[in-house]
Amino acid sequence: MIVMFQKPRGTRDFLPEEMKKRRFVENKLREVFERYGYKEILTPTFESFELIAKKTGEEIRKQLYVFKDHGGREMALRPEMTSPVVRFYLNELKNLQKPLRLYYFANCFRYERPQAGRFREFWQMGCELIGCKEPLADAEVLNLAMDGLINIGLDFDVHIGHLGVLKGVLEKFNVSEEEEVKIRRLIDKEDYDNLKIYLTQILGEEKKELIFEILKFKGSREVLDELKEILKDFPKSMEAINNLEEILEFVIHDKYTINLGIARGLDYYTGMVFEIYGKKGAKQICGGGRYDNLIETFGGEPTPAVGFAYGFDRIMMNIDDLDIEEESILIIPVKKDKELIKKSLIIADKLRKAGKIVELEIMGRKLRKALDYANSRGFKKVIIVGEKELNEGKVTVKDMITGEQKLIGIDELTNF
């Protein structure tokens, strides 16, 4: 038989075992978000094209899934979650007392070339802290992003930077906003050859060298002292360094690297930025930072905000085999008899209400074939329901690992 249809390129089907792992990790991350007081929200899968395109960045704009609805309105599938969350905030939440702590788990779409860790439908899980400009807010988001990964037992590296450091230099060099955006995009793509050419063209050799010196700053918190010496004549850059130092005062984990080469691919970040890398598989598993102008750009009052998103699929690629034991029970009526089946249903219902995972043999298999099925599916226990045993108020419980069988009273089943 020829299968007529295949899943679209860049998408995936998830088998039950994979879904069990994904739900386990999702719930472990939710635990941490909710311990920090974040509340879950969800936005539509598609938004107006204008909203999505406004501050997304040139590279991602090229990857949008865009369509016109029956009313001729131009729509786009969401490529990330921050812009939709800001739209949601402006529509529904702007009058609430600040700060607002929000989190989401949602599928996003980009027409990317499918490869390891990159899919056309992928999942983001993240948090947004809206309405607080204090360094403590940035630190909270950093702590939260790290705590979530610690809670799932992931080994990772955190790199923290600040866009204000480079911005302060570029402003003093009279670089236009358009030129700055191009510089940031080249940095984000790590296209340093073209960056050198472009900076030399617009600034000259000496200024280009200073910018490259800044981008190479990487290490422990102490590198900021050296950076201050180099940038002491750049007041706005010094403000950014001081802001970063204040943020780091409140970061409770010392597992981070200062990295001034982080630019982030989205156009809305304004201050502290960070990226988290896994130790294997797809490398970057999380990114975030401060975006104080985005809400105003979308027509709201000036409102500070900071947030992050995990690449959920990339997290899954970095996780070793999870030991998620869920003991399921198969109930087998020994023959296709209505009364036996009804009794089996009553037993199944009782066990499910006691919190057990129970399946009923519904194919009408003979006992031996039903046991073979149980073995192939990995059931550790089966309950065999026979007429004789039922008349005594009992059933046979078989341990599929040891082969041991014993009669147990129906009233005792919830305790076995």
Swiss-Prot record:
The keyword Endoplasmic reticulum does not apply. One of its GO terms (molecular function) is ATP binding. InterPro entries: aa-tRNA-synth_II (IPR006195), aa-tRNA-synth_II/BPL/LPL (IPR045864), Anticodon-bd (IPR004154), Anticodon-bd_dom_sf (IPR036621), His-tRNA-ligase (IPR015807), HisRS-like_core (IPR041715), HisRS/HisZ (IPR004516), HisZ (IPR004517). Keywords: Aminoacyl-tRNA synthetase, ATP-binding, Cytoplasm, Ligase, Nucleotide-binding, Protein biosynthesis. It is found in: Cytoplasm. One of its GO terms (cellular component) is cytoplasm. This is Histidine--tRNA ligase. The gene is hisS.
